[in-house]
From Swiss-Prot:
Superkingdom as given in the UniProt entry: Eukaryota
Name of protein: NAD(P)H-quinone oxidoreductase subunit 1, chloroplastic
Cellular component, GO annotation: chloroplast thylakoid membrane
Quaternary data: NDH is composed of at least 16 different subunits, 5 of which are encoded in the nucleus.
Organism per entry: Amborella trichopoda
Subcellular location: Plastid, Chloroplast thylakoid membrane
């Protein structure tokens, strides 16, 4: 039986086409996974570099300069060092909870990125309950901290875990009330709809100007949720050695380090989305309508511009928590709880009532 060479070539080309389709299919399968992970990783590296440089400037010293140009690879060097450190376990602690605790904290913060929009419909999960889902997910992280403190079988670690739980409960409620005010003002709990509601009026339509009291309450509450100075009571070195991190070393300690900066990144992105107009340009005093409608531009250019403005606003906002860390002293535990329950909670509740009243009267 004689087979025509053209038929053999056609069969070979068809098989090569099928194999190339499979390869491209695998590539497109991993792109949606690789892109957010790489973006989050780069975001954390930028935050670490910014904090080191800003703190060096405040303290009038030279920051990192040997790990890469301008020290931009210092965070990678620190992470690599922690990766090869010995992973010690407490002899009388609960090993399972001790190992699970850091993962619970990091995963809960990573899941918060699902509802953060970086552009027009450029969001992993455009849900109608976006901000409510973020509040629910962020409340899981203190459970991981409490697990870590309890499983360490150490009085300092356990005290740090209890402080983390008490601090989270104290500031989660004002934070939720501020988010509810924004949802009422925008008539939606979707993060995309909240940004859409702000772009209609340009720069002066940002919720920063429409909700100044809520913005201040949200700012203080988010700093407390991130456990940044002056709210780092769960890991106060002078009182608790290192708090719930005392018994941790190696990669598990690195996960807590990563979670701290991830939480700061999430908070700054949500401030951008909820109060700073999201991805919109919104330049004041420029009467060009197209500049206010940057969220309607499609294609690669529009996507790039949207991501750029979102990240630019977020990183500009980061100067506030980073500068606060190196300028304000740590509060006492009673002062922290009084600030949350006796000051922020009434202010956030009053702001919610004012927002509700204004919305009812505007009907």
């Amino acid at each position: 039986m004689i087979i025509d060479t053209t038929e053999v070539q056609a069969i070979n080309s068809f098989s090569r086409l099928e194999s190339s389709k499979e390869v491209y299919g695998l590539i497109w399968l991993f792109i949606p996974i690789f892109t957010p992970v790489s973006g989050i990783t780069i975001g954390v590296l930028v935050i670490v570099w910014l904090e080191r440089e800003i703190s060096a400037g405040i303290q009038q010293r030279i920051g990192p300069e040997y790990a890469g140009p301008l020290g931009i690879l210092q965070a990678i060097a620190d992470g690599t060092k922690l990766l090869f450190k010995e992973d010690l376990l407490p002899s009388r602690g609960d090993i399972r909870l001790f190992s699970i605790g850091p993962s619970v904290v990091v995963i809960s913060i990573l899941l918060s990125h699902l509802v953060i929009p970086f552009g027009y419909r450029l969001v992993l999960a455009d849900l109608s309950i976006g901000v409510s889902l973020w509040i629910a997910i962020s409340s899981i992280a203190p459970i991981g901290l409490l697990m870590s403190g309890y499983a360490s079988n150490n009085k300092y670690s356990f005290s740090g875990g209890l402080r983390a739980a008490a601090q989270s409960i104290s500031y989660e409620i004002p934070l939720t009330l501020c988010v509810l005010s924004i949802s009422l003002l925008s008539n939606s709990s979707s993060t995309v709809d909240i940004v859409e509601a702000q772009y209609k009026y340009g720069f002066w339509g940002w919720n920063l100007w429409r909700q100044p009291i809520g913005f201040l309450a949200f700012l203080i509450s988010s700093l407390a949720e991130c456990e940044r100075l002056p709210f780092d009571l769960p890991e106060a070195e002078e009182e608790l050695v290192a708090g719930y991190q005392t018994e941790y070393s190696g990669i598990k300690f690195g996960l807590f380090y990563l979670a701290s900066y991830l939480n700061l990144l999430v908070s700054s992105l949500f401030v951008t989305v909820l109060y700073l107009g999201g991805w919109n340009l919104s330049i004041p005093y420029i009467a060009i309508p197209e500049l206010f409608r940057i969220n309607r531009i499609g294609g690669v250019f529009g996507t790039t511009i949207s991501i750029f403005f979102t990240l630019a606003k977020a990183y500009l906002f980061l100067f506030i928590p980073i500068t606060t860390r190196w300028t304000l002293p740590r509060m006492r535990m009673d002062q922290l709880l009084n600030l949350g329950w006796k000051f922020l909670l009434p202010i956030a509740l009053g702001n919610l009532l004012l927002t509700t009243s204004s919305q009812l009267f505007s009907l």
